[in-house]
Every structure is written in C-alpha cells, then in structure tokens.
Swiss-Prot record:
GO MF term set: ion channel regulator activity; toxin activity
Annotated tissue distribution: Expressed by the venom gland.
Functional summary from the UniProt entry: Ion channel inhibitor.
UniProt subcellular location: Secreted
Leader sequence residues: 1-19
A GO CC annotation given for this chain: extracellular region
Membership in a protein family: Belongs to the neurotoxin 25 family. ICK-8 subfamily.
Principal localisation: secreted
Taxonomy, superkingdom: Eukaryota
Positions of disulphide bridges: C59-C74, C67-C80, C71-C116, C73-C87
Record's protein name: Toxin ICK-8
Amino acid sequence: MMKLYSLVIIATLAAAAFAATSEEISAAVSEIISQHQEDLERYAKIVERGEEPKKYIRCSKQLGQSCYLNCECCGASAVCEDIKYICKDKVSDNSILDAMGKAWNAVGNSISRYYCSAE
C-alpha cells in the first residue's frame, strides 16, 4: 500500500512540475502562428510591388545565420526569428511547450517551403 501512495505522490509531483498553464500554451501558439503569418505578409508585399520575388533557396541557412523567410532555415522545426532575422529552433524554456512549438513549426514549415526553391 505504501508503494501505491508513493507512486501516486511521485506521479502528481511530476505532472505538476511539467504542467504548463493555458496562458503559456496560448502565448507560444500565437507566437508560432505570427511567425508564419509574417512570411505570408512579406511575400505578399513583394508581389504587390510587382517586383520579381527574390529567389530564396530552401535550407540554405544554418541555426544562428541571418535569414528572411522560414524556409531558408535548415531543420524541420527551424524558423526565421522575426526580430533579429536569424534561424532558430527553440520556442520556449519549458520543455513541453518547446516540443509543442517545434511540432507546430514543422507543420508551418511544410507550408512555407513553397516560397523557396529546392536548389
């Protein structure tokens, strides 16, 4: 019986330690969505001006290098940070939110990869 109580207490403490509040989750999700929305907006502005869109090469930048669109960054979950315009793949300091963010980035990157050529 003591083992059962210990197991319940350990499981509860582990769940509490890794639990993320709904505010943290919604903040991380909205940040990820805004990053991919900015890709669409940047590309639309180029097309509106009637300019020939610059040829972006898919997976041409490594983490920490300067970028313009998410599809330039190598890695399934790598994105082009919207403030410094560098490739990064970390979303949050919380490991659960970071894993969720990386999964969401991978989904978004599968869409934004059409902005870059595969050269």
